[in-house]
A protein has these predicted regions:
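Glycine-rich loop-to-alpha-helix module at the N-terminal edge of alpha/beta enzyme cores
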Residues: 1-38
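Rossmann-like NAD(P) dinucleotide-binding subdomain of oxidoreductase/dehydrogenase enzymes
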Residues: 24, 32-180
Length: 180
């Protein structure tokens, strides 16, 4: 919570909700969703056959790009694909490296093996361009601006022929809706 307060100028109540409470909720929900996915099997197998679904990680890595203003989302975007067996390259927003760094230390202390989530702070171009150019890009997990996400889509579209698989792309952008 303290790193969120310092890094994102949140008060103690905002930081508690943002970094600790909601991240714990994400972890609980993600574990439940993972169990539900793995339990989904075809309801019928003909005699002498066994119909089954096998889930496996993507072939390559997932690029998690996290926002500047929400520590729990910054913790969720790299951990959700890692929980499903994927290797993740995590690029935090340049202005949220401090809280992201402490999340990464927490993951390591909890036993996350080296190389599962790889913390890559840096500018969007320095980190993003080589990642999006890699033939091993298998997925994007993004929260941030619409313009950045559109730029990523454009670059992926231009690179589509060189990727080993079609990248799966998940993004949340421009959450500026009003509430009445």
């Amino acid at each position: 919570n303290a790193s969120t307060m310092l890094n994102q100028s949140k008060n103690v109540y905002q930081a508690e909700i943002d970094s600790a409470c909601e991240l714990i909720d994400f972890f609980n929900f993600n574990c439940q969703y993972m169990q539900e996915i793995y339990q989904q099997q075809p309801p019928y197998s003909p005699k002498g056959m066994w119909n089954m679904v096998q889930y496996r990680p993507l072939e390559g890595f997932v690029f998690a790009v996290t926002p500047f203003n929400f520590t729990s989302i910054a913790g969720n975007l790299p951990t959700a694909p890692a929980l499903m067996g994927n290797v993740v390259l995590w690029k935090p927003a340049s202005s949220s490296v401090y809280s992201g760094y402490y999340l990464m230390q927490m993951f390591k202390e909890a036993g996350l093996p080296d190389g599962v989530i790889n913390f890559l702070p840096g500018s969007g171009g320095q980190v993003g361009n080589p990642v999006l150019d890699s033939e091993h890009l298998a997925g994007i997990h993004f929260t941030g601006s619409t313009a950045v996400f559109q730029g990523m889509w454009e670059k992926i579209g231009g690179n589509i022929a060189k990727y080993k698989t079609y990248p799966r792309i998940v993004g949340e952008t421009g959450g500026k809706d009003f509430i009445i």
